Each structure stands twice: as C-alpha cells, then as structure tokens.
C-alpha cells in the first residue's frame, strides 16, 4: 500500500498538483490489493460513502481524466455514453456483461 507522501511525489512528478481531493481519490483508487473497474459515478459514490468526503462529481471527473492522460488509468468505452476506467493499465482484454453491466478482465 502506498503512503500519502508517495502519492504527493507521484502527482508532482507527473505535473499534477497534489490537492486534498486528488489525494483522497488516489487513496480510493490505488490503495487496494487488486486492480478494479469503475465508472466516475461509482467512484464518487465510493468516496462519499467510505471516506465520508464531499468531492464534487466535476472534480472526480476531471481528476480521473487527468490520471488517465498521465497513464495511471485506462478508459474502456462501452458505448457513446458509458465508460469504465481500469486501474490495471497493462494490455489485456475486457468482456462486458450487458445483463449485469459488469466489466470483466
């Protein structure tokens, strides 16, 4: 598990300011044993429920896209209005279960 100081260093090295909101989002995304898939709405809900933090949906959206642009996340477009993000940035295949709306490696 990464420490807050490691997130700060990684963000600064990438040219991103280590704001309180970005650090909280890093904590949710990268302090896990396994990689996972999520939507921006799922992530915002998780932050609100598990960290008891108020971070606007716009901030979550902008941060996720900044992380994607820096190569920390991969975006998987399901259709024109549905995207998932993956913390596993290696090249691999995905399968989308339309019945459960679940993205599977």
Where are these regions (language model features)?
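Short alpha-helical segments that sit at the start of domains
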Residues: 1-26
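Non-DNA-binding regulatory cores of transcription-related proteins
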Residues: 69-105
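Short capping segments at the starts of secondary-structure elements
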Residues: 20, 32-38
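DNA-recognition alpha helix
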Residues: 39-52
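Basic amphipathic alpha-helical segments that dock to polyanions
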Residues: 60-70
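Short amphipathic alpha-helical elements of helix-turn-helix/winged-helix folds
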Residues: 27-32, 46
């Amino acid at each position: 598990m990464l420490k807050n100081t490691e997130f700060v260093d990684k963000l600064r090295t990438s040219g991103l300011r280590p704001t309180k909101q970005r650090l909280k989002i890093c904590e949710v995304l990268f302090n896990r044993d396994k990689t996972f898939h999520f939507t921006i709405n799922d992530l915002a809900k998780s932050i609100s429920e598990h960290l008891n933090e108020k971070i606007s949906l716009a901030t979550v959206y902008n941060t996720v896209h900044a992380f994607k642009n820096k190569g920390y996340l991969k975006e998987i477009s399901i259709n024109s209005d549905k995207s998932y993000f993956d913390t596993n940035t290696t090249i691999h295949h995905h399968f989308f279960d339309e019945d459960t709306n679940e993205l599977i490696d």
